[in-house]
Amino acid sequence: MVTYGADSWTALGDPTRREIFERLVERPRAVGELARGLPVSRPAVSQHLKVLKAAGLVVDRPVGNRRIYQLNPDGVDALRAQLDRFWTRALAAYKAAAEQPTEEVG
């Protein structure tokens, strides 16, 4: 069972995983294609995909003898919802701070 939450943010905290995630935004890809141009090996890319999958951000499916990875819409939606909640709270806090009377110095 996949749970969506803080693990998503932790997973995307790694620059290589973020790059893999961004490549999957464009289209589904196999490990070899994802590894091309990255400063890590194919096995390392597989490990990064495992973390992204555990965080609920990607899913995979077999195609012949390869696995094709793509973004998991449910995981991406959950991540976006968390960001929306954070942004709403941050803007409300900023508004409240901006509306506070200021003390005059002098």
Regions flagged by a language model, labelled:
Residues P62-I68:
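Short, Lys/Arg-rich nucleic-acid/phosphate-binding segment
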Residues H48:
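Residues within the DNA-recognition helix of helix-turn-helix
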Residues R18-I20:
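Pre-recognition alpha-helix immediately N-terminal to the DNA-recognition helix
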